[in-house]
Design a protein with these regions (language model features):
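Intrinsically disordered, low-complexity, charged terminal extensions of DNA damage-control enzymes
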Residues: 1-137
Length: 137
């Protein structure tokens, strides 16, 4: 008050910019029609089920890392989800893969069981695509 700064104090800096991540969401289906999923253990979306969710990379590279052999691939589309402190820019890909052992931390989930899993809203675009094109045909 005494320095004439009542209009500028207290100084509030704006909110921190949100961290942005580019993610590959992979709906991997084996020859038995099961979808590869895992239950998240990270703090973000803890205990919710998700499809393969990796930093953006070529699909074949992602499958190689999981020990899976691709038979066919289709682009699903892109989506974005804004969390309180992070933004996911997601690129969805469907891949038909040969039957293979389950990669560590993942499960092959029969299509009829997917709707019984707790899935994050962030992946709803890809769940809708799967519902329309894979498990409700």
């Amino acid at each position: 008050y005494q320095h004439g700064k009542t209009e500028t104090l207290p100084f509030r800096s704006g909110p921190k910019p949100k961290k942005e991540e580019h993610r590959l969401i992979l709906l991997a289906e084996d020859e038995q029609g099961r979808i590869l999923m895992r239950k998240r253990s990270e703090r973000l979306l803890h205990n919710l089920w998700e499809y393969v969710n990796l930093p953006v990379q070529p699909t074949q590279q992602a499958l190689d890392a999981l020990g899976l052999q691709m038979l066919e691939q289709r682009e699903i589309g892109k989506a974005q989800h804004v969390f309180t402190h992070i933004i996911w820019h997601m690129q969805g890909v469907y891949a038909k893969v040969q039957n293979a052992p389950v990669p560590e931390d993942y499960e092959w989930v029969p299509k009829e069981e997917i709707e019984t899993k707790a899935l994050p809203t962030a992946l709803s675009v890809f769940t809708k695509w799967g519902r329309k094109n894979l498990w409700n045909q």
